[in-house]
């Protein structure tokens, strides 16, 4: 009986680790990239992300997965010189990522943010498959 409980706990731990949406996003950008980052979600009433360094890993903190993804995009653009766009969501990250020299925090006081214009829904979205939707969701998060 104890072995069953242990196996259940291990299974839950694996599922919880693999379920991180930002780590999955990193893997879609570049296979193996999630191992170069430490992702931390912290409760906060303010939308924010932080960039920090721990050893050879970049730490990205935020109050939810979307703000962590925004932090990832900020890091890639302003620290690593990697530009992701609506048409190109994959990149080859360097073996050793550029270090975050000084802890960096960005907050927003905007309560609402939006994406798309009213035409997008009629022109193209009706024809998207899951792969295309996944790319769009990634882009919205970044």
Regions found by a protein language model. Name each.
Residues 1-9:
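Sec-dependent signal peptide recognition
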Residues 1, 19-20:
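Absolute protein N-terminus
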Residues 9-17:
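Hydrophobic h-region of N-terminal signal peptides that target proteins for export
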